[in-house]
C-alpha cells in the first residue's frame, strides 16, 4: 500500500512483524484475550509455535507505525509483543 504525504510525496506504508511470546502457562490466557476484542486479525490464520511447544505467535501487518500495529492486539497480548519494522527483499 502507498500513502501520500502532505507534500505530495508517495511513500509505502510500513510493514511490521508482530512477534508475541508467552509461557506455556500463559497460552490459554493469550488466546482467551481475543474474546470480545475487535480486530481485523481475529479469526485469521497466524503463524504459531504453540502446538510445537514454542509458545510464540507472529503476524505481518501493514500500519502507519508501531503503536497502530500493537493496537491490533488485545492489551494482554500487546504487552508481550515486539513490533519489528520489516521490508520485503528479493533473495538472489
Model-found features: residue ranges?
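Conserved, structured core segments of small domains
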Residues: 2-92
